[in-house]
Amino acid sequence: MPRVVFIDEQSGEYAVDAQDGQSLMEVATQNGVPGIVAECGGSCVCATCRIEIEDAWVEIVGEANPDENDLLQSTGEPMTAGTRLSCQVFIDPSMDGLIVRVPLPA
């Protein structure tokens, strides 16, 4: 079972177990990680589950798909190679130890 560490600058670290195939949004909301609002429930239409994948994990997690990228760009927030929507990142065994930053609310 992969372990994921969510880091929230206000609340601290949350190290939680995840199931293969779960989205990071599901993992975060099921474990009470603050900052993942997920208003649309994972439909990739609201961008309220925005996260930053730590640099060392970007290649393993992969890039945003075109729809996700368009939605992220529409927010006007600065983006990095690790900017993703947690509803669009699905856990697999290679992600054991994944570190995810949850941005402060705007």
From Swiss-Prot:
Q: Which UniProt keywords apply?
A: 2Fe-2S, Electron transport, Iron, Iron-sulfur, Metal-binding, Transport
The record's GO molecular-function terms, alphabetically, read:
2 iron, 2 sulfur cluster binding; electron transfer activity; metal ion binding
- How are cofactors bound according to the entry's free-text note? Binds 1 [2Fe-2S] cluster.
Q: Which Pfam families match?
A: Fer2
Q: Which SUPFAM superfamilies match?
A: 2Fe-2S ferredoxin-like
Top-rank taxon, per record: Bacteria
Report domain 2Fe-2S ferredoxin-type positions: 2-106
- For the ligand ([2Fe-2S] cluster), the binding residues are C40, C46, C49, C87
Q: Which GO terms describe its biological process?
A: P450-containing electron transport chain
GO CC annotation terms, alphabetical: cytosol
Cofactors: [2Fe-2S] cluster
Q: What does this protein do?
A: The oxidation of alpha-terpineol by cytochrome p450-TERP requires the participation of a flavoprotein, terpredoxin reductase, and an iron-sulfur protein, terpredoxin, to mediate the transfer of electrons from NADH to P450 for oxygen activation.
Which protein family is named in the record? Answer: Belongs to the adrenodoxin/putidaredoxin family.
**This protein is called what?**
Terpredoxin
Q: Please tell me the species this chain comes from.
A: Pseudomonas sp
